[in-house]
């Protein structure tokens, strides 16, 4: 988004960048500027797209976008911290004025336990009687011992570090010493 390069008809177009996983930044040798974009290295010397001597396409996109959103308000805040931002926390803080989080999640009407036909028994805030049957069915399906008084901790997520799996792994041994059961559902990296 360089006003010296864009045609007049494109100058009024506004852009929104959605950050799903800041770990994937599009880092390349600066030679890519010529190979892919037909630009000389001098074009990037203003610091917009270079980071640690490499082209960083995500950094450039964040700086040039009119608005940046993340997949949740929590993730938007996490992106301003070193732990989650994978070295782009300074850029994210600098662009905080245009950063927001858009919450995604389940459809609470479709997956309402009071009416869901796909669970063992229905329940609601006013009538919790079916909840124990659902817990027993989950324990049966996952091969856990059916222990009615032991809490089940559930995690449904992509199984990658930026979703917190590394944090769970750090404390997993301690968690398993507690009177609890853990159910994890998701796809992710083989490690």
Language-model-detected regions and their locations in the chain:
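Catalytic cores of nucleotide-sugar-dependent glycosyltransferases that transfer UDP/GDP/TDP-activated
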Residues: 1-191
């Amino acid at each position: 988004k360089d006003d010296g390069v864009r045609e007049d008809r494109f100058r009024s177009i506004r852009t929104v960048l959605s950050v799903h996983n800041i770990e994937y930044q599009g880092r390349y040798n600066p030679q890519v500027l010529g190979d892919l974009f037909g630009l000389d290295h001098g074009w990037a010397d203003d610091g917009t797209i270079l980071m640690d001597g490499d082209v960083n396409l995500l950094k450039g996109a964040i700086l040039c976008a009119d608005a940046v959103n993340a997949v949740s308000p929590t993730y938007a805040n996490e992106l301003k911290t070193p732990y989650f931002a994978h070295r782009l926390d300074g850029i994210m803080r600098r662009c905080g004025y245009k950063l927001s989080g858009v919450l995604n999640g389940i459809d609470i009407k479709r997956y309402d336990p009071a009416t869901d036909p796909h669970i063992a028994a229905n329940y609601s805030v006013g009538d919790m009687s079916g909840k124990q049957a659902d817990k027993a069915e989950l324990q049966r399906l996952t091969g856990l011992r059916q222990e009615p008084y032991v809490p089940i901790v559930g995690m449904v997520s992509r199984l990658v570090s930026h979703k917190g799996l590394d944090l769970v792994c750090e404390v997993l041994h301690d968690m398993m010493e507690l009177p609890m059961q853990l159910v994890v559902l998701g796809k992710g990296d083989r490690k």
